[in-house]
Every structure is written in structure tokens, then in C-alpha cells.
């Protein structure tokens, strides 16, 4: 499923435009599975699956697989419908240079919501 993130995000011109000043690599952990996602000027250029020995990323988003499953459901329940709600419930850990994450929060919310069963934005 994560493999489709590149085509889903890059296929949304409005989302790419929103992230036009964003160039970074971040780590997404879904339970024991890890993914390095590289973004250049709002376009996802690579989605690489782990495991990684020493991953180089600006920041990391880590949550159990069951929490991501709820987040990516067609109609996520309250508390699982938004990245900040997951952080507030302390099930999503955001670590590293959070300035990049917070400055582009809407981009990351919409990009990760593209993996929902219906592909809707956040």
C-alpha cells in the first residue's frame, strides 16, 4: 500500500503545489516496518522499504500498525482521523527536526491521507 503513495501524491497537482517549497526525507514506521520517503519540491521521488541500518532522515513518524490501519480506513474514528489527533493520543511519535513537519503539516496530513481506502485528502 505504501508503494502507491508516490503516484497518489504526485497525481494531485494541488498537493504538489502546496509542497513546492518542501524538500526532505522522512522515516515512516508502521509497526516493525520502516519506509524512507524522499520528497523534492512537493513531489515524492522515492519510497524505499527497510529495514535500515542507519537511516538518514529529517524526522520520523512512528506508530503501531493497528493505528495506521485505523487512520487509513475509509472513515477513521475520532482520534484516529488526523496526525495531530494520533500525536495527542500518544500513539504516533514524531521525532527529529519537527520544524519541517510542522511548517508543512497540511502537506503531510493530506499526503498520508492519500493512502486511505478511498484516497481522500485529510
Show which residues each predicted segment covers.
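Feature captures hydrophobic
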Residues: 1-122
Amino acid at each position: 500500500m505504501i508503494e502507491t503513495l508516490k503516484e497518489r501524491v504526485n497525481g494531485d497537482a494541488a498537493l504538489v503545489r502546496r509542497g513546492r517549497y518542501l524538500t526532505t526525507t522522512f522515516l515512516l514506521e508502521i509497526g516493525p516496518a520502516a519506509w524512507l520517503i524522499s520528497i523534492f519540491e512537493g513531489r515524492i521521488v522515492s519510497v524505499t522499504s527497510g529495514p535500515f541500518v542507519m537511516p538518514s532522515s529529517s524526522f520520523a513518524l512512528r506508530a503501531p500498525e493497528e493505528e495506521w490501519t485505523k487512520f487509513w480506513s475509509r472513515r477513521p474514528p475520532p482520534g484516529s482521523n488526523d496526525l495531530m489527533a494520533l500525536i495527542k493520543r500518544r500513539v504516533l511519535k514524531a521525532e527529529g527536526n519537527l520544524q519541517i513537519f510542522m511548517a508543512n503539516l497540511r502537506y503531510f496530513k493530506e499526503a498520508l491521507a492519500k493512502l486511505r481506502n478511498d484516497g481522500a485528502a485529510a
